[in-house]
Amino acid sequence: HEKIKILDIFRHENKLRIGHLKGNNFFIRLKKVSKPAAKILENVLRTIDKNGFANYFGYQRFGKFGDNARVGEEILRGKNSIKNPKLRDFFISAYQSEIFNRWLSRRVEISKFAHEFNKKEFAKIYPNLSEIYGDLRSENGIFSIIRGDVMGHYPFGKCFLCENLGDEQVRFAKRDIVPTGIIAGAKTLFCDGICGQIEREFLPDDEILAKMNGSRRFAWCYLENLKFNYDEENAHFMMSFYLPKGSYATVVLEEILHTRLRDYAPNLAE
C-alpha cells in the first residue's frame, strides 16, 4: 500500500512466530486541530499517561460490519458451518473478544458508580455488590480491583488471585500488577467470590466454554514513551507512544476523542 512505509529489513537467526512480538510503537497525526482543541488533547493524554486506560479490543477485531462475534457464537452453537479452520478460529476469537469487552465495560461502570454515588444509591443499582462498596471506594483510580480478581504481573508474568486487597491495591498503583479479564474458554483461571459472580454473568454455558481455549488478558494498560506536539501552522497534532502486544492504538484514540472510531473507519487512512 502506498501509505505503508517499510523502515528497515534485516535477518534474524530465528523465524518470527506468534508470541514473539513484545509490543508496537505508534505514531498518529490528527489534522484540522484548533489550538484550544490541542490544549484539551494534551490534558487528556497526560491523564491517560498517568492513570492508564481500559484495555478493550479495538473495533477492527469485530469486522467491517461488526458481526464477527455473532458468527463466532453461531459456529460454537452449531448454527453456522465454516470449514476453513483458520477462519473458524478467527470468528470464535472475535466472540471471545466481545465477551471480554462487555465484562470490562461492566467493571469500569461499577468502579465509576462506586465513586459517583453514595452507598444507598449504589445498592439500588448493584444490590449484590453493596457489601464491597467500601473496598471499591478505597481506591483513587478509575478501575477498582476486588478480592478474587485474577491479577497479572505487568507487562509480562504469571496470573494469581487477589487475596490481600490492600497489598494488591498498592502494587496496582505502582504498575507492578494489573487486573485481568477472561478470554472465555476451558482450562483458564477464573475469578473467585463476588468477582467471579460478575465474570460469570458474561460467560456462555459450560458446553460452549469447553469448545474454546481460554486465557487471561490485561484489563488495564499503560502508555509508554508518550510524546506529543502541536503544529499550529498546519493545525496538526502529533503523538507517539508504545503499547504492549495485543493493545490497540485505536482504543487510545477513542479514549482521547470520546467517540467511536468505527463510525469514521472508511476515512481513517486519509
Regions found by a protein language model. Give the residues of each.
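Non-catalytic, substrate/partner-engaging modules appended to enzymatic cores
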Residues: 1-270
